[in-house]
């Protein structure tokens, strides 16, 4: 039973996917999803909020770059994460139209293009979040730490790492360019549905297990790296607080430094990511145990995009320099002339 769940876990990377054993049951539910206006409206509202928030965060990083302000080591990954989440949500919105809206459908090229890009952006979002956590741990590390030597690395090193990971993830998901097709016949049981128009060619149990194992190794490695870097940052913050109280007295509460505020925002982001990953795994397992219950299916549709929707708000709310920068832009353009 555990082996079946692991092999089926591969398809949780693709939205609206139904594992083969419950194909007929889930297919009928998918066809009728467009008639449920509550699920459709809630889903697109969630996607719309995420697109708006990530667009705002991306614009801030672009303005900061064009104005020549001093950038931090984490600025590039934060801007990249907002861009990746923005593109992923746009792909999810396009894919959702083929599930929630009844229409003529797509051809092979559109199916391959949308599902492949969505899969790639989801992987890059995970990778960039991990990179962001590690970089913040490097920034916070003391001079005596072995991580301190990475603090002054040129920005192009980060760009090369991101580019290499992008190529790697594009290669990992390249099998979708072959296996994803336009559904030739809605009544056949030979294809596994992704949406109403798109299906994935059936794979052997061995191939499913192989891809599932590779994806599981990737996810476990990156999430473990995030957890370790998060634990390291928490330990450093606790030690810093104890030292500050010892030197200045417990009656004083010194203002948090920009590095500490940035670290707290990263900690919030990583905690959210880990919680959403665990919750998504639980819901995915419940779908397998309870024959793809439509309630669990609907919950997974929303939960899979919560991180991409909420993450920009974490930076916007906790990063004081974002508010100050936007305020300075408005003052420069005389948009705050309130008498």
Swiss-Prot record:
Listed GO CC annotations: plasma membrane
Keywords (A to Z) from UniProt: Cell membrane, Disulfide bond, G-protein coupled receptor, Glycoprotein, Membrane, Pheromone response, Receptor, Transducer, Transmembrane, Transmembrane helix
InterPro entries: GPCR_Rhodpsn_7TM (IPR017452), Vmron_rcpt_1 (IPR004072)
Protein localization: Cell membrane
Residue intervals annotated with topology Extracellular: 1-42, 97-119, 182-213, 286-296
One GO molecular-function entry: pheromone receptor activity
Protein name, entry field: Vomeronasal type-1 receptor A14
Organism (species): Rattus norvegicus
């Amino acid at each position: 039973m555990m082996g079946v769940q692991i092999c089926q876990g591969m398809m949780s990377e693709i939205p609206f996917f139904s594992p083969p054993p419950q194909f007929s049951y889930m297919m009928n539910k998918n066809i009728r999803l467009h008639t449920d206006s509550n699920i459709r409206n809630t889903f697109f509202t969630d996607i719309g909020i995420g697109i708006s928030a990530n667009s705002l965060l991306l614009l801030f990083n672009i303005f900061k770059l064009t104005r020549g302000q001093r950038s931090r080591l984490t600025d590039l990954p934060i801007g990249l994460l907002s861009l990746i989440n923005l593109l992923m949500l746009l792909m999810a919105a396009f894919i959702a139209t083929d599930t929630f809206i009844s229409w003529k459908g797509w051809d092979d090229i559109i199916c391959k293009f949308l599902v492949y890009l969505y899969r790639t952006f989801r992987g890059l979002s995970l990778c960039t979040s991990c990179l962001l956590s590690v970089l913040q741990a490097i920034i916070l590390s003391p001079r005596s730490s072995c991580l301190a030597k990475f603090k002054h690395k040129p920005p192009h090193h980060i760009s090369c790492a991101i580019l290499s990971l992008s190529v790697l993830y594009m290669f990992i998901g390249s099998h979708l360019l072959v296996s994803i097709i336009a559904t030739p016949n809605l009544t056949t049981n030979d294809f596994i549905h992704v949406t109403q128009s798109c299906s994935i060619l059936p794979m052997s149990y061995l191939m499913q297990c192989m891809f599932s194992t590779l994806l599981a190794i990737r996810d476990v490695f990156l999430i473990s790296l995030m957890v370790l870097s998060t634990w390291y940052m928490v330990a450093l913050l606790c030690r810093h607080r104890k030292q500050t109280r010892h030197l200045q007295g417990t009656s004083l509460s010194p203002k948090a430094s920009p590095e500490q505020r940035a670290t707290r925002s990263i900690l919030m982001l990583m905690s959210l990511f880990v919680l959403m990953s665990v919750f998504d795994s639980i819901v995915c397992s419940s779908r397998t145990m309870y024959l793809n219950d439509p309630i669990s299916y609907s919950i997974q549709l929303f939960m899979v995009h919560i991180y991409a929707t909420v993450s920009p708000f974490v930076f916007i709310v906790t990063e004081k320099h974002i508010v100050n920068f936007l305020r300075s832009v408005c003052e420069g353009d005389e948009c705050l002339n309130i008498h």
